[in-house]
């Protein structure tokens, strides 16, 4: 039985407990809002917001539970279309129905893992409960939620599988290198260096930072990510114990049929192997609302994050306020704005040149800038189609 400790306040770095025994990574909830398919949390009375957040919590759990039904419908549709072909054409592909049966088995396995994840998340927040499911039965989930869930399965590849190592090396290593350079152990006590990772996803970057002894807190807004990161960080200790089939949803651009049904194994490391006395926690909620206390953080590390903003200047403003004087902001990522072209959504799409100008006008001092850091994001390494990003890496400092 792991010893539980109290999570830090959502707006402050955790304080070192001094205990050396293994502890759970604590998840504390700020305000997550209703999380409509696109857009910021809905504003209203406190009671309305609590109700909407509770409904969204159970809506995401329902999506995890509905996955198998949705995917079996997809496979059945493919089989019906195949059966509509002339007999002579079907006879050319005797292995095709067998391949679909293999996909069905992969779907069933994924569903088992997803049920395990959500069965463990009902009481995952140390400071919040969401009551009972009002529906009490599995309901059809939206296409939006199913797409989110499929994307979350690919996050396991990126963050916690051996398959994702090359992608992590491209995205996370440059950030970690800058942290080590700016806070060397010869001059800093790492446990006193407070580092925040907004948009933490499944938590691997924040975990790697905590592995180096720094006090690190990850922040994430998506319940899809939070449920999954809680499972990996707190319920997985045996290396490569679990497997998933993240590519079965991809029916195009497969060189071989076997590529579609190949598994990945996770976690590739023991998430419980943090050094004794490690100071690592996760918070759930809107980055801009949770983190309001000025001059709190020594370092803020953002990876594939700033383009998730409705207005990236709001992110810059928050980072400026919560960084300590002398603190640094490390950013790596592209500018694929998440709310671009969505109806009824504010979306300010700035070029990197504009963002840089705003950052400098706030008073940040530019120390590192690399404009062509090549990276992928949840890439299927055997796919016939891959997207590559030429990311920007910059390090800026808030003056003393």
UniProtKB/Swiss-Prot annotation:
<feature type="binding site">
    <location>
        <position position="315"/>
    </location>
    <ligand>
        <name>S-adenosyl-L-methionine</name>
    </ligand>
</feature>
<protein>
    <recommendedName>
        <fullName>Carnosine N-methyltransferase</fullName>
        <ecNumber>2.1.1.22</ecNumber>
    </recommendedName>
</protein>
<dbReference type="GO" id="GO:0042803">
    <property type="term" value="F:protein homodimerization activity"/>
</dbReference>
<dbReference type="GO" id="GO:0030735">
    <property type="term" value="F:carnosine N-methyltransferase activity"/>
</dbReference>
<feature type="binding site">
    <location>
        <position position="389"/>
    </location>
    <ligand>
        <name>carnosine</name>
    </ligand>
</feature>
<dbReference type="GO" id="GO:0005829">
    <property type="term" value="C:cytosol"/>
</dbReference>
<keyword id="KW-0949">S-adenosyl-L-methionine</keyword>
<feature type="binding site">
    <location>
        <position position="155"/>
    </location>
    <ligand>
        <name>S-adenosyl-L-methionine</name>
    </ligand>
</feature>
<feature type="region of interest" description="Disordered">
    <location>
        <begin position="1"/>
        <end position="49"/>
    </location>
</feature>
<dbReference type="GO" id="GO:0035498">
    <property type="term" value="P:carnosine metabolic process"/>
</dbReference>
<keyword id="KW-0539">Nucleus</keyword>
<comment type="function">
    <text>N-methyltransferase that catalyzes the formation of anserine (beta-alanyl-N(Pi)-methyl-L-histidine) from carnosine. Anserine, a methylated derivative of carnosine (beta-alanyl-L-histidine), is an abundant constituent of vertebrate skeletal muscles. Also methylates other L-histidine-containing di- and tripeptides such as Gly-Gly-His, Gly-His and homocarnosine (GABA-His).</text>
</comment>
<dbReference type="Pfam" id="PF07942">
    <property type="entry name" value="CARME"/>
</dbReference>
<dbReference type="GO" id="GO:0032259">
    <property type="term" value="P:methylation"/>
</dbReference>
<keyword id="KW-0963">Cytoplasm</keyword>
<comment type="subunit">
    <text>Homodimer. Each monomer accommodates one molecule of carnosine in its active pocket, precisely anchoring the histidine imidazole ring such that only N1 is exposed and deprotonated for methylation.</text>
</comment>
<feature type="binding site">
    <location>
        <position position="199"/>
    </location>
    <ligand>
        <name>S-adenosyl-L-methionine</name>
    </ligand>
</feature>
<feature type="binding site">
    <location>
        <position position="338"/>
    </location>
    <ligand>
        <name>carnosine</name>
    </ligand>
</feature>
<dbReference type="GO" id="GO:0005634">
    <property type="term" value="C:nucleus"/>
</dbReference>
<feature type="binding site">
    <location>
        <position position="158"/>
    </location>
    <ligand>
        <name>S-adenosyl-L-methionine</name>
    </ligand>
</feature>
<feature type="binding site">
    <location>
        <position position="303"/>
    </location>
    <ligand>
        <name>S-adenosyl-L-methionine</name>
    </ligand>
</feature>
<dbReference type="GO" id="GO:0008757">
    <property type="term" value="F:S-adenosylmethionine-dependent methyltransferase activity"/>
</dbReference>
<feature type="binding site">
    <location>
        <position position="286"/>
    </location>
    <ligand>
        <name>S-adenosyl-L-methionine</name>
    </ligand>
</feature>
<keyword id="KW-0489">Methyltransferase</keyword>
<keyword id="KW-0808">Transferase</keyword>
<comment type="similarity">
    <text>Belongs to the carnosine N-methyltransferase family.</text>
</comment>
<dbReference type="InterPro" id="IPR029063">
    <property type="entry name" value="SAM-dependent_MTases_sf"/>
</dbReference>
<dbReference type="InterPro" id="IPR012901">
    <property type="entry name" value="CARME"/>
</dbReference>
<feature type="binding site">
    <location>
        <position position="220"/>
    </location>
    <ligand>
        <name>S-adenosyl-L-methionine</name>
    </ligand>
</feature>
<feature type="binding site">
    <location>
        <position position="307"/>
    </location>
    <ligand>
        <name>carnosine</name>
    </ligand>
</feature>
<feature type="binding site">
    <location>
        <position position="287"/>
    </location>
    <ligand>
        <name>S-adenosyl-L-methionine</name>
    </ligand>
</feature>
